[in-house]
UniProtKB/Swiss-Prot annotation:
InterPro entries according to UniProt: UPF0728
Protein name stated in the entry: UPF0728 protein C10orf53
Residue pairs linked by disulfide bridges in the UniProt entry: none
Family indicated by similarity: Belongs to the UPF0728 family.
Organism this protein belongs to: Homo sapiens
Superkingdom, taxonomy of origin: Eukaryota
């Protein structure tokens, strides 16, 4: 996938640290940072599926995981799921 691709990051609500179930973006920060470093435009899109993160490129889901498996905050460089997502975007056609 060329640089400057549009990546839609779809995410569902989850419960964090006793807070009510809502659409939180704390765990998406590293993923957004890793994709931005590669030059991609990331568009956040809320979905209703609980605990879900999906990356879409060209209207195709190319990566998905449980949002609770992503590291909280940070730059995403040490999060293995962020690296898997980055590679999935690079391999998208």
């Amino acid at each position: 996938m060329p640089k400057n691709a549009v990546v839609i990051l779809r995410y569902g609500p989850y419960s964090a640290a006793g807070l009510p179930v809502e659409h939180h973006t704390f765990r998406l920060q590293g993923l957004q940072a890793v994709l931005a470093i590669d030059g991609h435009e990331v568009i956040l899109e809320k979905i209703e599926d609980w605990n879900v993160v999906e990356l879409m490129v060209n209207e195709e889901v190319i990566f998905h995981c449980n949002i609770k498996d992503l590291e909280f905050g940070g730059d995403g460089k040490l999060d293995p799921l962020c690296e898997k997502a980055r590679i999935a975007v690079l391999n998208a056609y």
